[in-house]
């Protein structure tokens, strides 16, 4: 089949050909797969990809031929009645009997006939066919997993505009008006790089609902979002999709214009509208000149009039679509979104190539919010934002009228934004009404109920089995025993509810030292002379300090931490430290400090030599890196697992003070809870920078604000600081 498709459709994208070939071979193997459905699917795929009609017809003919051959060689399995074999079969060895003997519906004790020649009631040919059928079903699932993996591992490289137009086709006819924007897809199988992500899962998303997708690190949440964004999972084409996954590519386009250009169809329609308007103007002039010329050919006039009428109709469709897109308010909407995400009016006019990676990520988010897709997919949006920007995004999304599916570890953000929670685990998706706090409470209760039901069912089955074992050979009770055997066989297979292991982090005990511990006195700092980053900073860190530092990105928070650990030196002022003070510093980009070609155990031994393997293992185990995980190369670990190795490095330093720069990035909820508990138990001082409101609220007793080159104590809690930020932000709602 592969050769036929390749030879006839060489001009079609190789990824499409690969998918069609695999799907066709898979369907031919599967005795349950309907031929009409397969042929129709492959035909439409090839035609949409630009294949010639006659070439597609040849492929269709070949498919029909192969399906016909399959049907001719496929006999129906007979499971009822006895069939006398044409020849007897020697059954001297039980090990030679097929494992599918149970298919015949009756049992016999083979040991009782060992050494004798018996006439089997099993038709060998039909038994082999049954085995092939079972094997084909298993192969089908494996093959589909390989195709899903290949499509995700090697995605097509397209520009943003090409990808947008391919994923979100334009409808000018209005045929999609009134269609439901709800999504309901059953039987989803998804794999990535050979690992099963979902098996037979159901995805249900209702318009106007905002879903938080939660689950442990490495469970496949980001993979699911990517599959949805590429329509690997069959989302109806009238539903527009946008996924904020990676930073945009920088060029000379101003930031504001790049947001406007994100709505590709709006840009295309405006250009088309201008072309049509110019052409209509030209036609009117030509008609006017023809009307003055008595010798002019009337056929030319009629042709121009027909063209004018057609262009008038198309122009009307375009204007209606632009009105539906709220095109006249586009620039003000884009500017407001950018302002909410921290872009000043001056920054909005800067070329996108002048922004750093973090700011380009914000631009990607702004572009998605501006487009207002029917399905907005956000993957850890708070990782790229500061507290003021998170507050703006949270308020903005609460007025969003379409579907939002967001992956986030920020509990406070999910509590404010999410109307529902989807819990991804064990290759399935479970749904919960309410925000994250409600989900957390409900899940605990649901798990307890499932465990109670499982134990109850197991007790019932044990009771049935006990009766069967006792009376199955008792003549008086044999009928009752047989009845219970049938009842037991009809019961569904039970799987014990899976409980997720609780993660625990543990920092070592702290040796007490007398104050003063760590101080900054009238510190000023400049990277470039004449451009101050920090001015007149005074801060005192004690053994019982729990200081949270917040403020806009780029305000100097990380710079202040680097001054405290003497990675940077002040332009003026004094940073004083206790002579015996040990500080453990967690860098925001901690992955850069790890040798990813080593395993965690070897890395700790290399970085902190002189200790035994057991001590290294103990420190890694204190942060959930144990067993085989400690021996895996760190390049194969997830972001959260790498963070755990970094925390283990902190523990080996036996610190008096922990200085943490965005420690919650990449951690799942369970790891965040473990880190929160560990920081609260830590007996030394803590100063940390974080955008996670819930983490700050649970670990910090004082909030310091870094803004406009000044670091000052905020008089209030982190929640009050967030409200203060919102009061300074532009208001923005979504047009209904």
Swiss-Prot record:
One of its GO terms (molecular function) is ATP hydrolysis activity. It is found in: Cytoplasm. SMART domains: AAA (SM00382). It holds the Pfam family ABC_tran. One of its GO terms (cellular component) is cytosol. Residues 183-459, 518-734 form the ABC transporter domain. ATP binds at residues 215-222, 551-558. InterPro entries: AAA+_ATPase, ABC_tran_Xtn, ABC_transporter-like_ATP-bd, ABC_transporter-like_CS, ABCF_EF3_subfamily, P-loop_NTPase. GO terms for biological process: cytoplasmic translational elongation. This is Uncharacterized ABC transporter ATP-binding protein C29A3.09c. It comes from Schizosaccharomyces pombe (strain 972 / ATCC 24843) (Fission yeast).
């Amino acid at each position: 089949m592969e050769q036929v498709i390749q030879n006839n459709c060489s001009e079609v994208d190789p990824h499409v050909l690969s998918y069609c070939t695999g799907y066709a071979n898979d369907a031919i193997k599967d005795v349950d797969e309907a031929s009409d459905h397969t042929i129709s699917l492959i035909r439409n795929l090839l035609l949409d990809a630009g294949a010639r009609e006659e070439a597609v017809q040849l492929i269709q003919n070949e498919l029909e031929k192969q399906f016909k051959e399959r049907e001719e060689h496929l006999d129906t399995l007979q499971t009822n009645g006895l069939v006398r074999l044409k020849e007897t079969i020697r059954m001297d060895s039980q090990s030679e009997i097929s494992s599918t003997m149970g298919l015949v519906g009756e049992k016999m004790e083979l040991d009782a006939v060992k050494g004798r020649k018996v006439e089997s009631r099993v038709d060998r040919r039909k038994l082999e066919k049954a085995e092939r059928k079972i094997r084909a079903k298993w192969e089908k699932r494996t093959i589909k997993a390989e195709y899903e993996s290949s499509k995700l591992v090697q995605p097509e490289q397209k520009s943003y505009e090409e990808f947008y137009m391919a994923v979100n086709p334009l409808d000018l006819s209005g045929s999609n008006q009134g269609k439901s924007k709800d999504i309901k897809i059953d039987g989803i199988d998804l794999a990535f790089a050979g690992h099963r992500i979902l098996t037979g899962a159901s995805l249900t998303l209702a318009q106007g609902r905002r879903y938080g997708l939660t689950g442990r690190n490495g469970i496949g949440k980001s993979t699911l979002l990517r599959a949805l964004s590429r329509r690997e999972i069959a989302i109806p084409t009238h539903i527009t999709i946008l996924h904020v996954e990676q930073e945009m590519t920088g060029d000379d386009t101003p930031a504001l214009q790049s947001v406007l250009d994100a709505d590709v169809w709006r840009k295309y329609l405006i250009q088309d509208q201008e072309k049509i308007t110019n052409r209509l103007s030209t036609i009117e002039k030509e008609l006017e000149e023809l009307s003055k010329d008595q010798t002019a050919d009337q056929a030319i006039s009629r042709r121009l009039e027909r063209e004018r009428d057609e262009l008038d109709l198309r122009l009307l469709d375009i204007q209606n679509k632009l009105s539906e897109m709220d095109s006249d308010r586009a620039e003000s909407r884009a500017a407001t979104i950018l302002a909410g995400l921290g872009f000043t009016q001056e920054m909005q006019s800067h070329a996108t190539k002048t922004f750093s990676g973090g700011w380009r990520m914000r631009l990607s988010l702004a572009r998605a919010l501006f487009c207002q897709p029917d399905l907005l997919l956000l993957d850890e949006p708070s990782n790229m934002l500061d507290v003021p920007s998170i507050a703006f995004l949270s308020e903005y999304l609460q007025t969003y009228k379409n579907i939002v599916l967001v992956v986030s570890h920020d509990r406070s953000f999910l509590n404010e934004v999410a109307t529902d929670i989807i819990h991804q685990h064990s290759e399935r998706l479970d749904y919960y009404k309410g925000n994250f706090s409600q989900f957390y409470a409900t899940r605990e209760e649901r798990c307890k109920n499932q465990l109670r039901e499982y134990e109850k069912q197991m007790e019932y089955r044990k009771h049935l089995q006990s009766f069967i074992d006792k009376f199955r050979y008792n003549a008086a009770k044999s009928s009752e025993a047989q009845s219970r055997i049938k009842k037991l066989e009809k019961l569904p297979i039970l799987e014990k509810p899976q409980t997720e292991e609780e993660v625990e982090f543990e920092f070592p005990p702290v040796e007490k030292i007398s104050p003063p511990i760590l101080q900054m006195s009238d510190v000023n700092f400049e990277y470039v002379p004449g451009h101050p980053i920090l001015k007149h900073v005074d801060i005192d860190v004690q053994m019982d300090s729990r200081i949270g530092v917040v403020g806009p990105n780029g305000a100097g928070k990380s710079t202040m931490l680097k001054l405290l650990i003497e990675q940077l030196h002040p332009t003026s002022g004094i940073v004083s430290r206790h002579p015996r003070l040990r500080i453990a510093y967690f860098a925001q980009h901690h992955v850069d400090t790890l040798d990813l070609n080593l395993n965690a155990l070897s890395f700790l031994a290399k970085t902190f030599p002189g200790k035994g393997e057991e001590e290294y293992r103990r420190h890694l185990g204190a942060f959930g890196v144990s067993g085989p995980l400690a021996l895996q190369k760190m390049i194969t670990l997830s972001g959260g697992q790498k963070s755990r190795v970094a925390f283990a490095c902190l523990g080996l330093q036996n610190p008096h003070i922990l200085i943490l720069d965005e420690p919650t990035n990449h951690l799942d909820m369970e790891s965040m809870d473990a880190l929160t508990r560990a920081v609260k138990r830590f007996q030394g001082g803590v100063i940390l920078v974080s955008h996670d409101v819930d983490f700050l609220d649970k670990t910090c007793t004082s909030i310091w604000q870094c803004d406009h080159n000044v670091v000052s104590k905020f008089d209030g809690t982190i929640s009050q600081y967030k409200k203060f930020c919102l009061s300074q932000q532009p208001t923005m709602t979504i047009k209904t």
